[in-house]
Amino acid sequence: MAGAKEIRSKIASVQNTQKITKAMEMVAASKMRKSQDRMAASRPYAETMRKVIGHLANGNLEYKHPYLEERDVKRVGYLVVSTDRGLCGGLNINLFKKLLAEMKAWSDKGVQCELAMIGSKGVSFFNSVGGNVVAQVTGMGDNPSLSELIGPVKVMLQAYDEGRLDKLYIVSNKFINTMSQVPTITQLLPLPASEDDDLKRKAWDYLYEPDPKALLDTLLRRYVESQVYQGVVENLASEQAARMVAMKAATDNGGSLIKELQLVYNKARQASITQELTEIVSGAAAV
């Protein structure tokens, strides 16, 4: 019964792992609900900022802010939002693949790329593949604050202000639902003109008091910060949803494996009993 004992040991090991994955699934489900609440709370502000900025980009302004002007593209920057922990399926790698494809397209045109990383998985991945990481922040936990994100955002905005970057993008996972998270790359600077037909029809004229430059400087920076924060909270909700689904799949696979091992164990035990009975019958016949 040495084989049967080994199989019993494997079954116990899988059962222990199954308990862990089930617990992780339940924790991820709880965290996902909290992350969804934060995401829903921040969305109205981010969407309103996007609408106001869309009007600005479409309007004929008395002062043309540098963030509104297109440049010849020689260098682009990416704010990349990844997770700090793993066990969330292909969430990170799908995002990185999409970004690598876009970076290759820029590279083919002779354009260089700079990366500001949010999340340790992105830092380790792009350090290993040779990405030009100029800023990073990790370990923000499950309740990130805007103050924690200011570092990488400030580095990229300063590079844009000094003309060292000609475009700035945010790369993150957009939360659609529990089963679907979509890797997205969204242009932050220069501000893209809105594609919303309603905004194009209802152009706004602005009167600035006291000074359009000071007001636009503050407003446009707040816009970038709001979009980055929204990207982070959506990515966090995506992470918890992906982890919950991955752990459920692992738990289900563990159940299937246990059934297979149980069947193998029963066959091994049956074979052992049959062999013992055969030996007893053979011994009795010999007597």
Curated annotation (Swiss-Prot):
UniProt-listed InterPro entries: ATP_synth_F1_ATPase_gsu, ATP_synth_F1_gsu, ATP_synth_F1_gsu_CS
Membrane topology (UniProt): Peripheral membrane protein
CDD domains: F1-ATPase_gamma
Lineage: Bacteria, Pseudomonadati, Pseudomonadota, Gammaproteobacteria, Enterobacterales
Organism field: Salmonella arizonae (strain ATCC BAA-731 / CDC346-86 / RSK2980)
Protein name, per record: ATP synthase gamma chain
GO cellular component annotations of the record: plasma membrane; proton-transporting ATP synthase complex
Family of this protein: Belongs to the ATPase gamma chain family.
Subunit organization: F-type ATPases have 2 components, CF(1) - the catalytic core - and CF(0) - the membrane proton channel. CF(1) has five subunits: alpha(3), beta(3), gamma(1), delta(1), epsilon(1). CF(0) has three main subunits: a, b and c.
Leader peptide range in chain numbering: none
One Pfam family in the UniProt entry: ATP-synt
The keyword Membrane belongs to this UniProt entry's keyword annotation: yes
Subcellular location: Cell inner membrane
Major subcellular location class: membrane
Organism domain of life: Bacteria
